Amino acid sequence: MELVHGGDWMSYRERFGRDALDFSANVSPLGLPEGVAQAIRDALPLADRYPDPLCRTLRAALSRAEGVPQERILCGNGAADLIFRLVWAVKPHKALVTAPTFAEYASALDTVGCEVKRFFLDETNDFAPTDALVDAVDESIDMVFLCQPNNPTGQLASPELVKKLLRRCGECRTILAVDECFLDFLPDADGWTAKPLLESGDLVILKAFTKLYGMAGVRLGYCLCGDETLLEKMQTAGQPWAVSSLAQAAGAAALKETAYVDEVRALIARQRPVLTAGLRALGLRVIDGKANDLL
């Protein structure tokens, strides 16, 4: 079986008999916060019960943290689960994705036989998105995926560009999915998020605990959307107990780890220029990314 996603440390261990120094998964280098680990241990007595399929306690905590009503929040088994649920709920015939970008968008779209149109970002412009992306959306496009900041380029679309793109999607009756899984690595993430645009029912914001909190193995993500009917369709598009009790407890605990988040952000801000300079000293071209990865 061919795996397109990074982080396949088990295959490396089976082949070479040791663990890899894995640069394929851009997860917090500080590991799982102790408060989250303790929350998982404390939740173990609940392991003999089915988890809350509506993630009510976690959604209440997310509502407070994000400033978004609970009714506009859906939790899933990682952001990838929600990407697939969105595609299965909408069943788009044609979708637009940038290139390069996260591979799971196209993988999900392939499962419903959707035609994937790729908008190739300009390397001479350091792969930065421009108004040309807005122009690529027409009435034949049912869904657009925008990774913000983009994986693997680390580039951001300006808030004004995202607003233009959403306006165009509204005109074309197109769903815009903005993936903000890496956005919270930025100290000024609040200035870049698409949350102020959530009143538009055409916008879905994808987020996850995976990267920032070092929780890739826990599998926990969530999405924000102003269209509650679409969220209900996404809820029923997959299996009902997608988020375990342990993951729900971990997520609620992670939201309290503000000092940990500050430490991760400070570490990335210090080390990004160091790594950039080192790679350039080797003669490599490095794109000035904004998150915790470099292309």
Predicted regions and their residues:
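PLP-dependent aminotransferase-like
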Residues: 88-146
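N-terminal "arm"/small-domain region of PLP-dependent enzymes with the aminotransferase-like
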Residues: 1-49
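Conserved beta-strand elements of the Class I
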Residues: 21, 74, 94-96
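Short loop-beta-helix segment that forms the pyridoxal 5′-phosphate
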Residues: 51, 63-85
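Short beta-strands and strand-loop turn motifs
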Residues: 118-120, 143-150, 176-180, 287-289
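Active-site pre-lysine segment of PLP-dependent enzymes
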Residues: 110, 127-139, 152-176, 180-212
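PLP-dependent aminotransferase class I/II
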Residues: 32-33, 54, 202-280, 284-287
